[in-house]
Amino acid sequence: MKTMKTIITAILAVLTFTCCMAREKKPAIKARLKGYPSGAIDEYHFHAGKAIVKGRFVNRTEHSFSTFNVTGTDLFSNQAFVRTINIEPDGSFLELISLPHSGWVYFDGAEIPPAFIAVGDTLDLLINGTGDETTISGSGATGEVNSVWPRLETQFASKETRTPWKEMNREFMLEWKNRKVRELDRIASAIDADTITLLNGCSDYAKDVLKTSLLAMPLEQALVALHQWWWRTRSEDRKPNPALTISSDSFFDFLSARQSYLMDNPLMILAADGDGVVNNMEFYVLNAYLYLANDMERWSKSTDSEELGSYKENFILPYNYDPELHREMLEYDKGRLIPVADYYSMCSDSIRSRFKLDHTGFMMQLCLLHRVLDFDFEGSDGWFLTRKAEELAGAIPQFTDPSICHHAVDAYRRFVIEREGSARIDASNPTPGDSLFQSLKEKYAGNVIYMDFWGIGCGPCRKGMLDQRTLVEQYKEAPVRFLYICNEKDSPREPSEKFLTDNNIQGEHIFISSDEWNLLTNKFQFNAIPFTLLIDRNGNIVEKNVPPTAARLDELLK
């Protein structure tokens, strides 16, 4: 415990120094187009805070649900968040919710379109329970953005927002990209000339959010098209077809000249399509942070120690000095160590040389932060905590944006608190979600449990269940239980059970109500399916969102 606190203290001290240097080196947000950004949104606007969600359902049916979820993504840590809203018998609701930062949210369990919500504001919803009509208003920038955006989106939206699948080929994809760049330039010109009349009367804060949402719209459509193309041109083992491959360098050749308002723009966090832009940009443009090590063909051997294997594949130096390990690492890298800080620097150089991008750009820093904050690991051992501390320390030289520094430290602090047990649930005062989860586990106590939250309309969910049939059959006599849980509102019994029967999908099939589903999504903070949990025989969660394997199940059965 003392070691971890020392590591955190050191990271805080160095990051504080780094942030100070960042403020000296460049302004928080400088103007790129005329009057954009306005300067109304500063670093503090990207901090976490509270907001009020209130409103009313009218014309509700007698058996309507009593809760719905506000969902979204913390685009700094790349973690989903879920907040449950309780509905009173008269249809009204009023909740004070916490947000990781201002941005766009979605609604699960109710037919409500996405909405912008700023920390410190109130989001007001009037929902017609018999249809899909919703009136969205609110205080401050929240009210302004939600009032203007539907009309602004309609004015500037392209007639072609989705890539026609039947027409997709290499030439079409490059032409599609060029169309989206022309749309992007048209929007940038309108912003630069200040000719968007719908923005008249809006506050500078609201104008910045709305302008950024316009810029993000064609960019996100180009990125989604590439995402579709990437999956379409790969075989089942995800290997590309050389005859169909499009070079990322040629597809994204437009970014360099526009990087000031696309790549080095923190306001993209607040855009209506911000999550799509950030996630696809990370995977298709800035993926050197994810895959450069594979391109370098660095693989460990089964005979390597854990420390040596971690260095070979993740560039992590062992925490305590060992002369023998030092010799082995130098031998592997031909006399020059490559610690994780040098590896991240190599990644930045690779991206910069390919796309001619500024290595200090906000989007590049954000992608690296996502790489470092990949905390999808349920173990609480000191090795993993130390490894993450090393990765964060190695990334520090690349972080110059104060908002990135703030969220990096905050996310790691929360990660350590959770893993060290300081924020454990008080067993004497469990939440409804805790109680429901406990009741699901109790029936299968003493078994290894694979819990899969799925939906009939989810293709990856159905494929995962089909792929697991052999594994379910293999362990049918062992103390292993496969639980497939779905929301009966979204996955009605008749079509769901037909799919299960027709495809001989064994296991325990559990249908829960929409309210129960909301309790569990809130407890585990997931807003997409499939979402899976692997639970050991003592009832402890050991993995999230990791496909089950025979080797892992055998390990848990020992």
Where are these regions (language model features)?
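Short, internal strand/loop/helix patches
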Residues: 340, 429, 497-537
